[in-house]
Design a protein with these regions (language model features):
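Catalytic phosphate/metal-binding cores of nucleic-acid and nucleotide-processing enzymes, i.e., regions
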Residues: 1-106
């Protein structure tokens, strides 16, 4: 992965953390680990293993597969995929319907 791709991914993770925190999640950045989720998010006693995707093309099946593989036992998975050229994210959480979250402020 090139440095511009890593920078884009890092920007996406930072934006995702801000969005999660605006929705009362507590977040821990896990992106330094290769075989783990990008973010560990906690809310209401539930731990979420979050995969963040900041790509032009959203591939939900591929993203879900990676999220499931990286979620540790006892942790639910979540995928946050940035919708290109918007302030919105497609969010899919284990056991819930996909939805769109929009960044506030800016």
């Amino acid at each position: 992965m090139g440095s511009s791709s890593r920078s884009k991914g890092r920007r996406g993770e930072t934006s995702a953390i801000h969005l999660l925190e605006s929705r009362d999640y507590t977040c821990e950045d896990m992106s330094a680990g290769r075989a783990s989720c990008d973010i560990l998010a906690l809310k209401d006693g539930i731990a979420w293993a979050v995969e963040v995707k900041n790509r032009e093309i959203i591939n939900p099946r591929e993203f879900r597969k990676q999220a499931r593989a990286n979620a540790k036992k006892g942790t639910r998975w979540m995928v946050m995929a940035k919708i290109a050229d918007t302030r919105s994210w497609l969010v899919e959480r284990q056991g819930q319907r996909p939805c769109v979250w929009t960044e506030v402020g800016g």
